[in-house]
Amino acid sequence: MALPVALQNDKENLRTLVVGGGSWGTALAILLARNRVPTLLWARDLAQVSAMIITRRNDRYLPQVPFPPSLEPITDLEGALSQTKQVLVAVPSCGFRPILERLAGHLSSHVPLIWATKGLEPGTGRLLHEVVLELLGSGWPMAVMSGPTFAHEVVAGLPTAVTVAATESEIATCFARSLHGDTFRVYTSDDLIGVQLGGAVKNVLAIAAGISDGLGFGANTRAALITRGLTELVRFALAWGGQRETLMGLSGLGDLVLTCTDDQSRNRRLGLALAQGKRLDEALTLIGQAVEGAAAAKVVVARAKQLAVEMPIAEQVYQVLYAGRHPRQAVEVLCRREQKPEYA
């Protein structure tokens, strides 16, 4: 169904800067441009940007997908900020603070910021909206987008749906209008905490699913692991202030199922590689892109202990990644836990 003229005009006035030239940032930039949103795309690797300017595609990550006419790759990040009505950040969580620090001195007052990063800040374990509050101030309009999304499927026009969460409904609605299209449905939420935690913790659980499948434990095990993983996720999010219904939605259960069951997931592939005997560094090199769950396992387990939240699956992922536990032994530890009521 065609959009109303008024909404099309709104989109054409919402010049958006996408920060991050990986597969996900590029996919979102293409999505925005297809939606008639004038879009600028910046990446840290200036040689990569220069190549995108010439070829009109991202040969490194999405080589078969041409850029729409309204998508413009750029090399001058600070200069672009003066032309921007909203900013979308799609970088790994380890790069989120450095990018925000770079944006902070040049971003026009109260230009809305949305991020599509699915992780917690490494080292501190902070939610990314806390980093925004620290660097941009308490009144800055911000939102987060999360849900079951693989970049290649999004640019192929395969249908999916996501959640955009913001503390102000107007901000969530504005970003939702920019992203919403014929095959990309956007719902809004006010649960900034729950949406962020769904996107971060599911990465850890996907490593567990990859380990399980890599060891040949089968569909029963995978289904049980996803279900008990969801219980851990809900427990953790509630302790942090998230809402239960958020974790039953797209940014929780939806993304968890996707990431645990499809080999497009880098986190799942990490688990598969570990089950096959690869060391962590070998597996990460083999995958060749950021694997958010590896860093998230550290901060999730540490924060769970601070909050007195029991997360046995996440704990065993941590033990495999950083304490030398064999993947098969980790599964045995989980299976031998004391019998208890399901929702105790």
UniProtKB/Swiss-Prot annotation:
Catalytic activity: sn-glycerol 3-phosphate + NAD(+) = dihydroxyacetone phosphate + NADH + H(+); sn-glycerol 3-phosphate + NADP(+) = dihydroxyacetone phosphate + NADPH + H(+)
EC supergroup of this enzyme: oxidoreductase
GO biological process: carbohydrate metabolic process; glycerol-3-phosphate biosynthetic process; glycerol-3-phosphate catabolic process; glycerophospholipid biosynthetic process
Residues noted as binding sn-glycerol 3-phosphate in the record, renumbered to the chain: 118, 147, 149, 202, 255, 265-267
Active site: 202 (proton acceptor)
Keywords of the record: Cytoplasm, Lipid biosynthesis, Lipid metabolism, NAD, NADP, Nucleotide-binding, Oxidoreductase, Phospholipid biosynthesis, Phospholipid metabolism
EC number(s) stated in the UniProt entry for this protein: 1.1.1.94
CC terms in the record's Gene Ontology section: cytosol
Amino acids binding NADPH: 23-24, 44, 118, 151, 266, 292
Functional pathway: Membrane lipid metabolism; glycerophospholipid metabolism
GO MF: glycerol-3-phosphate dehydrogenase [NAD(P)+] activity; NAD binding
Record's subcellular location: Cytoplasm
Key word NADP present: yes
Protein family (similarity comment): Belongs to the NAD-dependent glycerol-3-phosphate dehydrogenase family.
Biological role stated in the UniProt entry: Catalyzes the reduction of the glycolytic intermediate dihydroxyacetone phosphate (DHAP) to sn-glycerol 3-phosphate (G3P), the key precursor for phospholipid synthesis.
Name the UniProt record assigns to this protein: Glycerol-3-phosphate dehydrogenase [NAD(P)+]
Species whose genome carries this gene: Nitrosococcus oceani (strain ATCC 19707 / BCRC 17464 / JCM 30415 / NCIMB 11848 / C-107)
Annotated gene: gpsA
